[in-house]
């Protein structure tokens, strides 16, 4: 998973954002484009904090973390 610069603006490290987004406990699609869409994901980081993340997912499986903050 790649990480956009904007994903760390709320003080969440790349490692914690990736961990929470990679092991979500809840996922909701934000778009319905079959080629590329955004997903809202809730998951715990490496410090057991619940994070809200937004990931852009491409149809080829590529993922880009664009948002991460404490939920």
Language-model regions: role of each:
Residues 1-71:
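Ribonuclease/tRNase effector modules and their secretory precursors
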């Amino acid at each position: 998973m790649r990480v956009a610069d904007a994903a760390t603006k709320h003080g969440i490290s790349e490692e914690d954002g990736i961990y929470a987004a990679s092991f979500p406990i809840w996922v909701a699609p934000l778009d319905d484009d079959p080629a590329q869409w955004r997903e809202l994901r809730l998951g715990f980081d490496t410090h057991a904090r619940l994070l809200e993340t937004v990931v852009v997912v491409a149809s080829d499986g590529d993922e880009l973390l664009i948002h991460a903050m404490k939920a």
